[in-house]
């Protein structure tokens, strides 16, 4: 029996579409394999990424599979995001601009072009845990601590230490990453899990440069103390 010409053309179109789709998916790389997204630390619960794109540079088309927190670590720069063949220009993200983007169960991909005059710099935390295992523990409440974003997979606190409040204490039910925005602080906590969580900084740690971070293991209490006369600010990210 001879194939009908229309049937053959339809088959060819479907085959070509699948080929294009397969090629597009293959061209995407996982975000942690994209050269401008450097993995700083990773365990079974979360991954920390240092994102740096110099002026005039572009990332590869990369794929996000997990909910992710990002915070701008400088005054920002203009960028162009290209997703699904559509380009969108975006203004710079100011220092400490923090967002949570949901990708778990609904992955997305894009590439980023730095079209500004300054580096594009982000500190990022991904929740790698299975969605069914996410914690429903309530948020913490403490001095100088504001719940900034209560996301389904990540929760963000804004801690600002200034006169007269020079320190604050938290106990987190889930692993928590504290990242310095400005000022100088000492993070005080037990280091019993330091070996198991190495090379993550755990326990007594001085943070004196923006972007420095410390890991607070689940269930442990830590105190953040401002050092010197400058105000200090950090963000704490609970991996739920």
Model-identified regions with their sequence ranges:
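Bacterial N-terminal signal peptides
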Residues: 11-24
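Short N-terminal segments immediately surrounding and downstream of signal-peptide cleavage
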Residues: 28-48
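A short beta-loop-beta micro-motif enriched in histidine and acidic residues
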Residues: 56-69, 164-177, 199-201, 208
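Short beta-strand His + acidic residue motifs that chelate non-heme Fe in jelly-roll/DSBH
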Residues: 59-61, 79-80, 109-115, 167-170, ...
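Glycine- and acidic-residue-biased ligand/ion/polar-headgroup-sensing regions
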Residues: 65-84, 173-194
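Short acidic-glycine-tyrosine-enriched beta hairpin
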Residues: 84-105, 193-219
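Ligand-binding loop in jelly-roll beta-barrel domains
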Residues: 105-128, 217-240
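Surface-exposed beta-loop interaction hotspot
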Residues: 109-162
């Amino acid at each position: 029996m001879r194939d009908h010409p229309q049937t053959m053309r339809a088959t060819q179109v479907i085959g070509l579409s699948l080929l294009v789709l397969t090629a597009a998916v293959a061209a995407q790389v996982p975000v942690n394999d994209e050269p401008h997204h450097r993995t700083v630390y990773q365990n079974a619960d979360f991954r920390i990424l240092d994102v740096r794109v110099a002026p005039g540079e572009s990332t590869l088309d990369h794929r996000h599979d997990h909910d992710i927190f990002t915070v701008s670590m400088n005054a920002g720069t203009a960028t162009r995001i290209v997703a699904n063949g559509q380009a969108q220009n975006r203004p710079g993200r100011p220092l400490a601009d923090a967002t949570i983007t949901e990708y778990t169960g609904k992955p997305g991909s894009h590439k980023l072009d730095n079209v500004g005059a300054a580096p594009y710099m982000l500190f990022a935390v991904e929740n790698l845990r299975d969605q069914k295992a996410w914690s429903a523990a309530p948020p913490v409440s403490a001095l100088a601590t504001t719940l900034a974003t209560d996301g389904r997979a990540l929760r963000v606190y804004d801690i600002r230490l200034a006169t007269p409040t020079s320190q604050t204490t938290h106990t987190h039910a889930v692993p928590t990453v504290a990242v310095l925005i400005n000022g100088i602080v000492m993070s005080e906590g037990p280091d019993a899990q330091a070996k198991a969580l190495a090379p993550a900084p755990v326990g007594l740690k001085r943070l004196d440069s923006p972007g420095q971070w410390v890991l607070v293991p689940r269930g442990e209490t830590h105190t953040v103390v401002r050092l010197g006369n400058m105000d200090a600010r950090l963000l704490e990210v609970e991996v739920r």
